Amino acid sequence: MTESVFAVVVTHRRPDELAKSLDVLTAQTRLPDHLIVVDNDGCGDSPVRELVAGQPIATTYLGSRRNLGGAGGFALGMLHALAQGADWVWLADDDGHAQDARVLATLLACAEKYSLAEVSPMVCNIDDPTRLAFPLRRGLVWRRRASELRTEAGQELLPGIASLFNGALFRASTLAAIGVPDLRLFIRGDEVEMHRRLIRSGLPFGTCLDAAYLHPCGSDEFKPILCGRMHAQYPDDPGKRFFTYRNRGYVLSQPGLRKLLAQEWLRFGWFFLVTRRDPKGLWEWIRLRRLGRREKFGKPGGSA
């Protein structure tokens, strides 16, 4: 009997981008058996509801009257998929899409061949698919091109590392073992925290090098320091900085990631004091990290 695949897409006020994403999703050679769309702006007559209803496969529209963020949106969609009996859960957001119609079939074949609990495609720049949407560190070297992920001819899998949640494919049993994203994180860092759980579970996972998911470039946030040997993430938007730094304070306090703390202080200390000459920025980074470490998950502008 063929195992069922439920696609989960989270959206927030991007109906045009969502339509493009769903066009590619519903053109897969291996169609998902069911599509769940979580609308984080699901008040009243949302245009997303009509868009979802018009898809050529079975669908469920989950409109949320509260913006749950990416973390809460994916958690809601994943739990709904599990409750409906999904064997696999395939994730996507509204500002990206699979590179071609073979991505889901390729991921399933890769998971079967290598007995993977989770498999992700490469996440490439939607404007230049030869480049990665986010830089990937391998050892002390940062990779920025998709071709750099292959270290030998014919390599199909990059084991033990995966980008979540853009195009990520999970077995239902994997989600039962590691859980779903943490609602408290809202946005930013929820994928790192899930990746941490995947590693600690001991379950096999990785990146399929024969499949790609296209996403707007996020590399500009990663500022090179020490002649490019390291990077520090600095979003231009203050709200994104709040969630990035606060959540990273929490994530790096968790088992499995505490070993990165010394490097974190070196990178951001250098970035704020040497590169930017911004001691106030460093103190704000410290304040936000402290909020996360103490599990104070309020919104920007609050004391917690």
Swiss-Prot record:
Q: Which Pfam family, giving just one, matches this sequence?
A: Glycos_transf_2
Location in the cell reads:
Cell membrane; Secreted, Cell wall
Superkingdom per UniProt = Bacteria
Matches recorded under InterPro entries: Glyco_trans_2-like, Nucleotide-diphossugar_trans
Instruction: Determine if Lipid biosynthesis is one of this entry's keywords.
Output: no
Catalytic activity entry? alpha-L-rhamnosyl-(1->3)-N-acetyl-alpha-D-glucosaminyl-diphospho-trans,octa-cis-decaprenol + 2 UDP-alpha-D-galactofuranose = beta-D-galactofuranosyl-(1->5)-beta-D-galactofuranosyl-(1->4)-alpha-L-rhamnosyl-(1->3)-N-acetyl-alpha-D-glucosaminyl-diphospho-trans,octa-cis-decaprenol + 2 UDP + 2 H(+)
**Protein's UniProt keywords contain Transcription:** no
Q: Which GO terms describe its biological process?
A: capsule polysaccharide biosynthetic process; cell wall macromolecule biosynthetic process; cell wall organization
What's any one GO cellular component for it?
extracellular region
Family assignment? Answer: Belongs to the glycosyltransferase 2 family.
What quaternary arrangement does the UniProt entry report? Answer: Interacts with Rv3789. Is thus probably part of an AG biosynthetic complex.
As for what it does, the entry says: Involved in the biosynthesis of the arabinogalactan (AG) region of the mycolylarabinogalactan-peptidoglycan (mAGP) complex, an essential component of the mycobacterial cell wall. Catalyzes the transfer of the first two galactofuranosyl (Galf) units from UDP-galactofuranose (UDP-Galf) onto the rhamnosyl-GlcNAc-diphospho-decaprenol (Rha-GlcNAc-PP-C50) acceptor, yielding galactofuranosyl-galactofuranosyl-rhamnosyl-GlcNAc-diphospho-decaprenol (Galf-Galf-Rha-GlcNAc-PP-C50). Thus, GlfT1 is the initiator of galactan synthesis, while GlfT2 continues with the subsequent polymerization events.
This chain's protein is named Galactofuranosyltransferase GlfT1
